[in-house]
């Protein structure tokens, strides 16, 4: 009995340590890459956005130039600033040199002009839909008071999110030198952005019409630079909800995408990709994720999960079963494990279906849920059984003794009558 308890405790301790170790390694990829990327230096990070679980990782912790993916942090700080998105901003003269630098670098713009008054929501659409660098700089000035102070805010926010390989030097990513991050860090930033419904709506827009302003008499239609949200593109996927792309000569092609299907969400980051292969790889990796992971039964109510010792009962230990089935979402190769919360032993009598403890169910180290553990049989205490047997034996002996007494008395009475008859004769 002692050995059984010892081994169960040891197994529970090992499982707890293993789960803690798994939780401490968020960058550990659980699955091999299903495709060959166009470049060995390409960085890939695919994760389950619902749980944070890493699915695929290739060069995910290596610093890369991130080009316009920088604009995700710019958008996040605007959305977190509390400023009225329908409020207007006037482009300051302080943007004069900034706009010249953007023009000299052949950066994408929304055609903003010094002195132009534009709504913040229009700046946000220009930033995320057409990847306008001038919009990023105006947002930086509006939120931070200056571009330099805004960049400081960007780096501080990245550190708060747990980014360790990120350094921003501008609000748009057009100027590469020193503006670096990792695929894993960009996933952290993107996941925070994805929590904001406005970010999801804006970044998932294929085309947007900016209204006329004081310096633009006509409306301006801006189009997405990313074909993943273009219904007419060969790369279009209906499950993709929002996306941000980027490109510079040093950064190569970059993309962040979020995809939802069947109640499950994945986030994907690709850095330093080939121009011809980026969107094909995005589709292939997200298609693979939805095809390879599914909801499946993990625990039924008829399979023994563990046992518990009984006291005052010779029939021990007793098997324990899940009180209800448990299902989970994962890969076919994912291993199911348990952490039990049980007493060392329980006293008999035990009823059929009696709750004894609980089991926390894990799939590939990630918690799925907790279920009650119950018995599937009835056990009666040996003390009660022995007491009943003793009482029955005593009753039987009393009856037998009583019967013998009656017989003895009856036999004695017959002999007395016989002697009386003989005396009369």
Regions found by a protein language model. Name each.
Residues 2-3, 27-184, 188-197, 261:
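Active-site-adjacent loops and short helices of periplasmic peptidoglycan-processing enzymes
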Residues 2-14:
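Bacterial N-terminal signal peptides that target proteins for export
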Residues 8-9, 71, 157, 244, ...:
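Basic side chains
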Residues 12, 35, 43, 106-110, ...:
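A near-ubiquitous, low-amplitude feature marking generic local secondary-structure context
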Residues 15-23:
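Hydrophobic core
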Residues 21-22, 84, 214, 297:
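Residues in and immediately flanking transmembrane alpha helices
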Residues 163-167, 175-425:
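Domain-terminus/edge residues, biased toward the C-terminal soluble/receptor-binding domains
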């Amino acid at each position: 009995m002692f050995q059984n308890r010892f081994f169960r405790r040891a197994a529970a301790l090992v499982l707890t340590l293993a789960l803690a170790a798994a939780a401490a390694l968020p960058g550990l990829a659980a699955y091999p890459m299903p495709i060959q990327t166009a470049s060995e230096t390409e960085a890939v990070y695919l994760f389950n956005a619902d749980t944070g679980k890493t699915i695929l990782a290739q060069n995910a912790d290596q610093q890369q130039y991130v080009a316009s993916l920088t604009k995700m942090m710019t958008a996040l700080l605007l959305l977190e600033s509390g400023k009225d998105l329908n409020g207007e901003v006037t482009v300051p003269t302080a943007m004069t040199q900034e706009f010249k630098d953007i023009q000299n670098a052949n950066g994408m713009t929304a055609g903003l002009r010094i002195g132009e008054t534009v709504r913040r929501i229009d700046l946000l659409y220009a930033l995320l839909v057409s990847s306008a660098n001038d919009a990023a700089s105006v947002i930086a000035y509006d939120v931070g008071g200056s571009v330099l102070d805004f960049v400081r805010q960007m780096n501080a926010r990245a550190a708060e999110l747990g980014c360790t390989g990120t350094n921003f030097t501008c609000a748009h990513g057009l100027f590469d030198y020193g503006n670096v991050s990792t695929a894993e860090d960009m996933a952290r930033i993107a996941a925070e952005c994805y929590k904001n419904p406005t970010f999801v709506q804006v970044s998932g827009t294929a085309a947007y019409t900016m209204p006329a302003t004081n310096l633009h008499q006509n409306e301006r239609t801006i189009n997405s630079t990313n074909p993943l949200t273009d219904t007419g593109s060969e790369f279009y996927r209906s499950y993709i909800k929002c996306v941000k792309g980027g490109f510079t000569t040093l950064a190569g092609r970059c993309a962040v995408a979020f995809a939802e299907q069947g109640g499950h969400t994945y986030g994907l980051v690709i850095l330093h990709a080939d121009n011809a292969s980026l969107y094909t790889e995005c589709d292939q990796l997200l298609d693979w994720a939805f095809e390879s992971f599914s909801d499946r039964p993990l625990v039924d109510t008829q399979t023994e999960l563990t046992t518990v010792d009984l006291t005052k009962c010779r029939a021990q230990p007793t098997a324990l079963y899940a009180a209800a089935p448990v299902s989970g979402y994962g890969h076919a190769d994912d291993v199911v494990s348990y952490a039990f919360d049980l007493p060392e032993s329980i006293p008999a009598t035990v009823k059929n279906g009696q709750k004894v403890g609980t089991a926390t169910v894990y799939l590939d180290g990630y918690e799925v849920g907790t279920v009650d553990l119950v018995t599937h049989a009835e056990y009666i205490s040996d003390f009660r059984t022995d007491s009943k047997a003793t009482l029955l034996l005593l009753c039987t002996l009393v009856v037998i003794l009583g019967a013998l007494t009656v017989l003895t008395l009856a036999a004695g009475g017959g002999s007395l009558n016989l002697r009386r008859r003989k005396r009369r004769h």
